[in-house]
């Protein structure tokens, strides 16, 4: 099998250092693969550091990764900077605009539920902030994904927190939205069942979204939905992790899907395993905790904690989490018609798949 992609533990780069690129995305550029994401190496819940820039890794086989360092550095000195490390900035997503020949990076400020953009002449930077914080289509934004069609049109999919998924058309330069948008995947029960973290991919002319429920860093069941067009009404197909009895998407949250450029029908789901230290906690318990917490019944939750003697405390629902220990779950997607399945693999290789 040769080199393999391994799941179930921390990833190390070619120098043996722990990899830090959460909200992972992969780009294929000039014959190489580039994995990038939020650098959480100092985000242990006690430092006040939410992020330490955007880190990138390079690979020729998707199995071993060379650390290229920070392509977007934190601004340590200016507390008003959008890139100040104490600011709740996350979820980088980079897209190339053929017309402008610019690389465009979108990010969000989690606490303000606003987006901002940066641009660069090179994938590797330097990136320059090109907008202030804004509400896309005057809507609050949570986790998101970017995509472009074969004719060069760009779209953003984002969760309007606790209510629905929004698909908005990007401006020609990809640094904003035109104001045209649709909504889909509404969930009447809200938290913890409302959908977030949309990961888009396109296959055989159909558009797919993999989404998660709403339990913060704690994992939950995924859903996959399909549409005939980018801005269409997405129809839910079910949980792609149907073989996972824990109902936690293998203790992870899918962040993006990468289509291998040289392998036949190989789509790779990249997921964050935010809290490997809490994998023993049952979804059915914290699902109910989040439901109670969201509906502002905190006293009921505190009484329940005291009565049931749970191992984890209410503070674990806050942002004070040690996500410097976050890992990855990276798995191939299997298709049977419209059916989408993600099965657990301890180790696997892209070489198992036929060349195109």
Question: Where in this protein do the model-derived segments appear?
Answer:
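Carbohydrate-active catalytic/glycan-binding domains of CAZyme proteins
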Residues: 1-356
């Amino acid at each position: 099998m040769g080199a393999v992609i391994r799941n179930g533990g921390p990833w190390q780069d070619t120098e043996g250092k722990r990899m830090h690129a959460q909200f992972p995305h992969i780009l294929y550029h000039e014959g190489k693969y580039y994995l990038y994401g939020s650098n959480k190496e100092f985000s242990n819940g006690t430092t006040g550091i939410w992020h330490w820039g955007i880190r990138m890794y390079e690979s020729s086989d998707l199995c071993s990764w060379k650390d290229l360092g920070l392509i977007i550095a934190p601004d340590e000195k200016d507390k008003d900077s959008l890139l100040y490390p104490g600011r709740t900035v996350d979820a980088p997503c980079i897209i190339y605009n053929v017309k402008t020949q610019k690389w465009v990076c979108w990010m969000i400020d989690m606490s303000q539920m606003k987006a901002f953009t940066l641009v660069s002449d090179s994938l590797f930077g330097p990136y320059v902030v090109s907008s202030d914080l804004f509400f896309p289509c005057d809507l609050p934004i949570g986790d998101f994904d970017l995509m472009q069609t074969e004719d060069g049109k760009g779209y953003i999919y984002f969760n309007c927190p606790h209510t629905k998924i929004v698909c908005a058309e990007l401006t020609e330069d990809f640094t904003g939205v035109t104001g045209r948008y649709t909504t889909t995947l509404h969930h009447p029960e809200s938290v913890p069942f409302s959908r977030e973290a949309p990961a888009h991919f396109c296959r055989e002319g159909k558009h797919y979204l993999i989404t998660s429920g709403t339990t913060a860093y704690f994992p939950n069941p995924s859903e996959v939905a399909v549409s005939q067009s980018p801005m269409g009404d997405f129809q839910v197909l079910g949980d792609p992790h149907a073989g996972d009895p824990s109902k936690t998407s293998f203790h992870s949250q899918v962040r993006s899907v990468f289509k291998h450029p040289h392998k036949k029908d190989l789509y790779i789901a990249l997921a964050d395993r935010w809290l490997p230290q809490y994998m023993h906690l049952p979804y059915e318990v914290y699902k109910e905790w989040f439901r109670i917490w969201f509906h502002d019944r905190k006293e009921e939750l505190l009484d329940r904690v005291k009565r049931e003697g749970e191992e984890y405390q209410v503070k674990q629902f806050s942002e004070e989490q040690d996500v410097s220990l976050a890992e990855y779950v990276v798995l191939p997607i299997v298709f049977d018609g419209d059916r989408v399945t993600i099965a657990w693999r301890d180790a696997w290789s892209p070489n198992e798949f036929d060349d195109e």
